[in-house]
Amino acid sequence: MHEQEYLTPQGLKKLEDELDFLKSTRRAEVAKRLHEAMEEGEVEENPEYEDAKNEQAFVEGRILTIETILANA
């Protein structure tokens, strides 16, 4: 069980806006970068692919973190 989170109305709005941006815009941008990097060929030795994968992991992790905070607010 997660601890109760306390947010100001402004803090709540900021997190909701960030979550919306990550889900609606950032995810698509990262997916496009991944697709473009995969089209370049070998992904094992492609730094752009690795960078995009790392960014995807960060974005998905941030989405999960915000969703958890909002669920416990």
Where are these predicted regions, by residue range?
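N-terminal cationic and glycine-rich segments that engage phosphates or anionic surfaces
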Residues: 1-58, 64
